[in-house]
């Protein structure tokens, strides 16, 4: 594997000195880029794009050709594991992801296989290997998975949900069934992420998109407990370097201390959290990633720059901050605005790291 030329993203996650604050964007390979739309059209649909090694590699690299980003993230979907378990993932226009055979009972859960990452999910590992090779050591590659709780919400609801009544019904009336599902998912995620690391992923992110819909007690029991199990089961060093792990619970600002206690290296913050407050609470234990409101990218570049300056000042001096949006970039954002955002982070963050030169 090529020697890493720009490692500031990995260094910041491990709270080691950096020259400027590193930056990448959730969903940086996506529909806001015209070249992505062309490649997706070529693939036919989203799932075919994920499963085509060459095209998944191409869309991963597209934002890096445009912008001086400090990391690449594997182009894939969080629902690859439930799909590999046989639930039949498909996408309904305007509806988002759906499953042909959602989970309805304890029997359904008992029958679920734990997918082999090099077999049913081999297409993901092929993409990781191809992307890692194509990056030529320019920037690190982030691998990822959905959290067990978030995967379970889609598997039980049958797709996206607003009220989460089906999974909450199981959680409160058949908790042992839900725990069995979450345990199977945690085991599957450990295998899946470790396979990504062996294939070349240099950092790992766990997306807990729906943890924020839970009460504090239920979050600990049904979401965080299983992310903790995953953190404990991951390969944390590969190719002579540490492999940092970031946990991101959207709506999880109340639980940063508990999240930091899992042994992860960093926490992703959504835009509803004050980064200064977050650093005060957990900055001595973990790095922080985030957390500009993705909708700020609709604003004129001067306003974007102002927001970047505010967030940098909120975090303050020194390392331990990876700049990002608080969630994925919206599909109708002008690419030039994303470029202005990335440039502003690098330019304006220099003074915060001067003691490190």
Swiss-Prot record:
CDD domains for the chain: URO-D
Q: Which GO terms describe its cellular component?
A: cytosol
For this protein, the record's PROSITE patterns field holds: UROD_1, UROD_2
Q: Which UniProt keywords apply?
A: Cytoplasm, Decarboxylase, Lyase, Porphyrin biosynthesis
Among Pfam families, the record links this protein to:
URO-D (PF01208)
- The site annotation (Transition state stabilizer) covers 77
Record-level GO BP terms: protoporphyrinogen IX biosynthetic process from glutamate
Location(s), subcellular: Cytoplasm
Principal EC category: lyase
GO MF assignments: uroporphyrinogen decarboxylase activity
Q: E.C. number, please?
A: 4.1.1.37
Q: Where does substrate bind?
A: 27-31, 77, 154, 209, 327
Its function, per the record, reads: Catalyzes the decarboxylation of four acetate groups of uroporphyrinogen-III to yield coproporphyrinogen-III.
Q: How does it assemble?
A: Homodimer.
Family the entry assigns: Belongs to the uroporphyrinogen decarboxylase family.
Q: What is this protein called?
A: Uroporphyrinogen decarboxylase
Q: Which gene encodes it?
A: hemE
């Amino acid at each position: 594997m090529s020697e890493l030329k720009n490692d500031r993203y990995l260094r910041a996650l491990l709270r080691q000195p950096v020259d400027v604050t590193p930056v990448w964007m959730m969903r940086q390979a996506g529909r806001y880029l015209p070249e992505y739309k062309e490649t997706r059209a070529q693939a036919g649909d989203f799932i075919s794009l994920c499963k085509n090694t060459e095209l998944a590699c191409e869309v991963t690299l597209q934002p890096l050709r445009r912008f001086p980003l400090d990391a690449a993230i594997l182009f894939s979907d969080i629902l690859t594991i439930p799909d590999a378990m046989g639930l039949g993932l498909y996408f309904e226009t305007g509806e988002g992801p759906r499953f042909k055979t959602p989970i309805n009972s304890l029997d359904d859960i008992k029958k679920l296989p734990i997918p082999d990452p090099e077999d049913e999910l081999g297409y993901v590992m092929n993409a990781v290997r191809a992307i890692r090779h194509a990056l030529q050591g320019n920037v690190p590659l982030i691998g990822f998975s959905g959290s067990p709780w978030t995967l379970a919400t889609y598997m039980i609801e049958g797709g996206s949900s607003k009220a989460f009544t089906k999974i909450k019904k199981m959680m409160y009336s058949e908790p042992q069934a839900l725990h069995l599902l979450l345990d199977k998912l945690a085991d599957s995620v450990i295998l899946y992420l470790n396979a990504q690391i062996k294939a070349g992923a240099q950092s790992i992110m766990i997306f807990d998109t729906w943890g924020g819909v839970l009460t504090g007690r239920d979050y600990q029991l049904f979401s965080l407990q299983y992310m903790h199990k995953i953190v404990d089961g991951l390969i944390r060093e590969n190719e002579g370097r540490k492999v940092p792990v970031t946990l991101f619970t959207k709506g999880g600002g109340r639980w940063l201390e508990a999240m930091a206690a899992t042994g992860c290296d960093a926490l992703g913050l959504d835009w509803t959290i004050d980064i200064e407050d977050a650093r005060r609470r957990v900055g001595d234990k973990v790095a922080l990633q985030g957390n500009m409101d993705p909708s700020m990218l609709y604003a004129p570049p001067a306003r974007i720059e102002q927001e970047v300056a505010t967030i940098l000042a909120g975090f303050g001096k020194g390392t331990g901050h990876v700049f990002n949006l608080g969630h994925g970039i919206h599909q109708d954002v002008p690419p030039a605005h994303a470029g202005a955002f990335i440039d502003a982070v690098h330019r304006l963050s220099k003074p915060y790291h001067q003691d490190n030169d």
